[in-house]
Regions:
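Short, Lys/Arg-enriched phosphate-binding patches
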Residues: 1-4
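Accessory, typically intrinsically disordered or conformationally flexible segments
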Residues: 8-325
Length: 325
């Protein structure tokens, strides 16, 4: 029904070889022709799911931001843009002092520079994008505040020795700003890719027989990276992928144990593979893309998925390289 109600989706389906699910996704973005074109192009590149998920996440972030901004405005709060890392004036009120006392939103309620910016981030428990206001003073020194961190503020990114902000040239500051923006954008891309990858794994692991190379991969990961397996979150992920309830105890899943006990030999091997893959995923963090992907378990893990039909997102290709940030 969603496809039939979208002229763009109907035309794209007639012109390109789209699945019903892809056509429904196009209908979802019927009000954004540019995004529809990007999605159609992604079909050819095999990255449709990645582009769609990033678009959904972007929309969810904007919606969360707008909702919180409206609420703050209705409360009479001045909303400002989130400051750059080296902003000389805007500071989080909680990082400031006023005289001998720590500044708080309550104690600085009458500060002329009081405002707030809206920060949107992923809540990993609810798996939703949430917007939170951060109260600031828009000109802390003018309004009588001091920031104890001013004397030690550095670039805060990259390797090597960090240079204090006040010693940086304009060019170095701009490079640091661009680096920070890149990290923020790549963090968002990684979050979207993780969503797609885990959905793909859940679908792929419904199979009844183990894929080619399972034994070598599982044995190799256990032998070379035994530290992966004890992660408590691994059983939760594996149970979720395999359609089982979450662990009933400290890292233990009775449902998974029962599932293996009732499975035939081939399906039990698939479940074992799921446990190892879940152990890898449990060690994936927001900063995983920043590490050298040619060392440790990262390379073999992503290589195994790619060999079996998973299309890496651009950020996952980056993560598989030896590039670091």
């Amino acid at each position: 029904m969603a496809v039939a109600g979208s002229e763009l989706a109907v035309k794209a389906t007639e012109r390109y070889e789209l699945t019903l699910e892809q056509a429904a996704t196009l209908a979802e973005f019927d009000d954004d022709p540019e995004m529809v074109r990007a999605l159609v192009a992604a079909v050819k590149a095999g990255r449709f799911d990645h582009v769609a998920q990033r678009a959904r996440d972007d929309r969810a972030q904007v919606a969360a931001y707008d909702q919180t901004t409206v609420q703050l405005t209705e409360q009479g709060v001045t909303v400002v843009a989130e400051p750059e890392w080296d902003d000389p004036k805007v500071r989080d009120i909680r990082s400031l002092r006023h005289g001998d006392d720590e500044a708080t939103p309550e104690s600085q309620a009458e500060c002329p520079g009081r405002a707030a910016y809206v920060h949107v981030d992923r809540d990993w428990d609810s798996e939703q994008w949430e917007a939170k206001p951060v109260e600031v003073c828009t000109d802390h020194s003018t309004h009588g505040h001091t920031d104890p961190s001013d004397e030690s503020r550095t670039t805060g990114s990259g390797g090597g020795r960090k240079k204090p902000v006040e010693q940086m040239t304009d060019e170095e500051r701009e490079q640091a700003r661009q680096q920070r923006r890149l990290v923020i954008d790549h963090n968002k891309a990684w979050t979207s890719a993780t969503e797609v990858r885990r959905a793909w794994l859940a679908e792929w692991l419904t199979r009844k027989t183990p894929p080619k190379g399972t034994f070598g991969f599982v044995a190799g990961m256990i032998a070379a990276h035994p530290d992966l397996l004890p992660d408590l979150d691994a059983n939760r992920l594996a149970a979720e992928w395999l359609g089982q309830p979450p662990a009933s105890g400290y890292g233990r899943s009775d449902a998974l144990a029962d599932l293996i006990g009732n499975a035939d030999e081939r399906r039990a091997q698939v479940i074992t593979l799921a446990l190892v893959l879940a152990a890898c995923e449990a060690h994936v963090g927001r900063d995983t893309w920043r590490r050298d992907g040619t060392t440790g378990w990262h390379g073999p893990y992503r290589g195994f998925l790619a060999d079996h039909g998973y299309t890496l997102a651009d950020i996952e290709d980056y993560a598989a390289s030896n590039q670091t940030v």
